[in-house]
């Protein structure tokens, strides 16, 4: 019976944590997608055909660097959140062992 209680508690905790992480990740990505960089606006207004190949390469490189930076920020946020969850789980395990 105790295993079923632990499973249910763990399942609910995982659901809550997954929802929080997913919500934060979704809101961060949606916020970043809503803001456009000047390079994207330049491409939207002038079109890709009006730029020479060096400018196209430079714009693509900058966009790629921006996306990598965004992904790194999100990864760091999730890593921090999971670290806090692991700390809480370790504290609970220690408390249960001392009972």
From Swiss-Prot:
Claim: Zinc is one of the keywords in the record: no
GO cellular component: a single term: plasma membrane-derived thylakoid membrane
Protein's cellular compartments: Cellular thylakoid membrane
UniProt feature coiled coil, ranges: 50-84
Transmembrane spans: 10-30
InterPro entries associated with the record: Ssl2009-like (IPR040377)
The organism's place on the tree of life at top rank: Bacteria
Membrane topology per record: Single-pass membrane protein
Keywords, ordered alphabetically: Coiled coil, Membrane, Thylakoid, Transmembrane, Transmembrane helix
The protein, known as: Thylakoid membrane protein ssl2009
Organism (species): Synechocystis sp. (strain ATCC 27184 / PCC 6803 / Kazusa)
């Amino acid at each position: 019976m105790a295993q079923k209680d632990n499973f249910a508690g763990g399942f609910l905790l995982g659901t809550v944590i997954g929802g929080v992480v997913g919500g934060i990740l979704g809101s961060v990505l949606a916020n970043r997608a809503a803001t456009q960089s000047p390079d994207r606006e330049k491409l939207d207004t002038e079109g890709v055909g009006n730029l020479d190949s060096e400018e196209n390469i430079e714009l693509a490189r900058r966009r790629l660097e921006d996306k990598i930076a965004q992904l790194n920020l999100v990864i760091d946020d999730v890593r921090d959140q999971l670290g806090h969850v692991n700390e809480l789980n370790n504290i609970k395990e220690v408390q249960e062992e001392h009972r």
